[in-house]
Amino acid sequence: MTSIRTATALVALLAATPALAQTPSNDDLAALVRQQAAEIATLRARLDRLEGTTAAAPAPVAATAPAPTTPPAPQLAQSDTIGRDTVTRPFAPQLVPPGPAERDVAQARQANAAGVTTEWGAGLPVFHSADGIYTFKPRGRILTDVSSTFGSAYDGRNITTTGMRALRLGLEGGVGTHFFYQFESDFSENEVDIVTAFIGWRNRIRPGLDYDVRAGHLFNDRGFEGSTGSDSTPFMERTVVSTAIIPQRGFYGVGIMPRLFWKTGHASLTLTGDRIDGNQAVSDSRTVLGRAHWNPIKTDHSVLHVGLWGFDEALSSAATTLTRNTVIGGRFNGALRVSTGALLGGRSTTGYGAELGGYVGPVWVMAEAGERRARLTGGRPDFLSKAWSLSGGWFVTGDLPPYNPRLGSFGQPRVLKPIFEGGPGAIELTARYENLDYTSLLTGGRGWAATAGVNWYLNSFTRLQFNWVHWDTDNRAGAFTGPDSGETIGTRIAVTF
C-alpha cells in the first residue's frame, strides 16, 4: 500500500509540471505546494477508507434532539455477536459454539462469510483468515484427579493416589466450507499418546439432512457416555457399559467414519483397524461399529433420547488376549478392579447396547445397557460380558443439561452465570448405579457401584468435580478375591480449551 501512495504523489506532481515550466514566483510556488499537499492528503484519505483503517465519521446529530443510544449486547459465550464479530451458533442454547471440526456446513459457511478474524466462546479463540477461507483453533484439556479409597478388607486397596486423567494439546481447523481436520495428543501418562487425528469433508444433501466423512485415528461413536469426551462426562469415570462393552482395541482405531445428521438425530458407521501403533508385522484386527440416536421429543426445555449401537470385530493374531480388569471405584486405584482372570485364545467379539433417557428443564436421566460376546478357540463356550447403569442429575442453579442433540451425547455447557462475571456458576448434583458381570467365565468376577457427586462449573470451560463411590466386588482371580466392599472419594479440577 506504501507503493500505491507513492505513485499517487508522483501523479500529483506530474500534473503540476506545466505550471512549473512557466517560472512562477515564490508566492505561486508556495500556493502550488499547498495545493499538491491538499490533493495528496485527499487521495490518502480515500485510500485509507478503502483499506478500512479509518473509522467512519459519526453522523451529525441535532443538539436539541440527541439520538437515543442502545446499550451494547452482553458478550456471552453463546451470543451471536461479540462486538462486530459473528460467533457460530451452538447446536443447543445450553452448549458452547462448536469448534471448526464439529461445525455443520451451514455454520461453517456463515462463519467464513462473516468477515471476522477472531471468535470467542469456548476457551481459546477460533482464528479466521481475512478472506474467510482458513480457520484454526488451538485445543486441549487438563484434568487433574485425587482419589482415596478406604473400608476395603484388603490394605492394598486402601490407598490415596493422584493422577492426570487427561493432559491434552492439539489443534483443529478448516479450509473453505467443506474440509476440516483435527489433531490431539495426550501426555497424561508422562508419554506421548496420539488420540484424535483425522481429516474430514462435510456437505448438505438437502435442507435438514447433512453428512460428514472422517478418516484417520477416530474416537468411538458407541453408547451415550462412551461417545462423550472425558472432559464432559457427568462423573469422573464413564459407566461400566462404556468401559467393559467395548472393542478389544479400545476407544480409538484408524479407519473411516461417515455420519448422517437430521433434525432429530444422527447415525454413524465406522470401519477401523487397530489403534496407532508400531506393529506392522501382522494384519490389524477389523472392527465395524454403528450407532444411531433419535429424539422423538425435542423442545426448548426437554428432550427424549433413544439410542442403539453395536460392533463386530475379527481379532488379529496379535490381539487374542481378552483379559479385562475394569475400573469400578476409581481410575487411579489400580488394585480396585473387576477382573475376568487370564483369558487367552480370542477369535472375534460382538457387542451391542441401548440408551434411553433425556431431560426436562434442569433434571436429566439416562439408562444404558450392553452385552459383549467373545468367541474363543479350542471349542470353548463364548464369554459373555453384561453391564448396565442408571444415571441422573439436577442443575440446582437452573441451567439446562449440556445435551448435544446433534451427536446424542454431553458436551461443554454454556454456564448462565459464570463466577468470573459475579454469578454462582452452575451447580449440578449427580447420582449413578452401575453393575458389571463377567461370571460366565469360571475365573470371572462381578461388581457394582453407587456414586453420588457434585459438579461445579465455574464457567463454560472450568469445572470442579467431587464423587463419593460405594463399590462392591467379588473377584475369582487375582490378588483381591472374594466379596469386598468399600468407599472411594475423588476430586477433579478440569479445564477445557
Locate predicted features.
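Bacterial N-terminal signal peptides that target proteins for export
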Residues: 1-8
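N-terminal signal peptide c-region/cleavage motif recognized by signal peptidases
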Residues: 16-18
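N-terminal periplasmic/intermembrane-space "pro-region" immediately following the signal or transit peptide
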Residues: 21-143, 396, 400-414
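Glycine/serine-rich loop-strand microenvironments at binding/catalytic pocket rims
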Residues: 61, 81-98, 170-188, 255-282, ...
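A short catalytic or substrate-binding loop motif that flags glycine-/basic-rich loops and adjacent residues
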Residues: 118-119, 249-250, 347-348
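Outer membrane beta-barrel
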Residues: 122-316, 385, 389, 394-421, ...
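Outer-membrane beta-barrel pore domains
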Residues: 320-497
